[in-house]
Amino acid sequence: MDISNVLPASSLFLGIVPALIILYFTLKGYEEYFKDKKIFLSFVAGLLAGFFSIIFESFVRNFGVISLIILIPFFEQIVKTSILNSRLARGTEGAPIYGATLGLGFGSILTPFSIAIYASKWSGLEIVGLSIVTLGAIGFIFFHGATGIYIGYGVKSDRVWRYFIYAVLFQIPLMVVSLVSDEYNLEFLQVLIVVYSIILYWYAAKKVLIMTLPKSKRRKIVKE
C-alpha cells in the first residue's frame, strides 16, 4: 500500500500531536509554576528552531560522518540554549518547564522531514516502513524534550554551559545509532533510539524537573 500521497500534510501532525500529549502529562502538577503565554511561545520557538536545524543539517551532510556526529548535536543544543538563556526563561522558576516545551516543539518538527527523507530513498512509504520511521521520530521528540529540561535546569541554576555540554554528549550516541540505521538500512535500530530517549526523558521529568522547586513544593508534586 503506497500512502505517500496522503502524508505530506498529515505527517506534521504525527510529530506535533505526540509532542503535545507528552507536554500535557509533563505539565500536570506544575500549573502554578509557568505562564501559558510562555508555554505557547516556547513551543512555537521550538518548531522554528527545529526547522532551521533541519536546514543546517542539510548543509553539513556533505562534510562527513564525524561532522554530522559532532556538529549537529552542538548546533541543535546551542540553539536551544540560546533561546532558553534569553528573557524567555532566564530568571524564572519555570525555566526547565519552558525547556521541556521548547524541546518537544523542536523534536516534533523532525517527524515530517524524517518521513520525507525515507520517501525520497524508497520512492514511497509502506505501512511497516512508516511505522518504524515514525517510531524513531517520536524517540527524538522525547530526546529533545529531555535535553530541554536539562538545559532549562542549567539556566535556572546558573550552570547553563555545564548542562549544555551534557545535552551535547547525550546526543552523540543517538546520532551514531541514527546514522548507522540510515546508512545500512537497519530500521530496527530505531527501537534503540526510542528506548534511550524515553529513559532519558523519564529521568529528566521525574528527577531533574522537580529539583527546580522548593522542597515543600516537591513533596506536593510527588503526591499528585
Give the positions of each predicted feature.
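Hydrophobic alpha-helical segments at protein termini of multi-pass membrane proteins
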Residues: 1-224
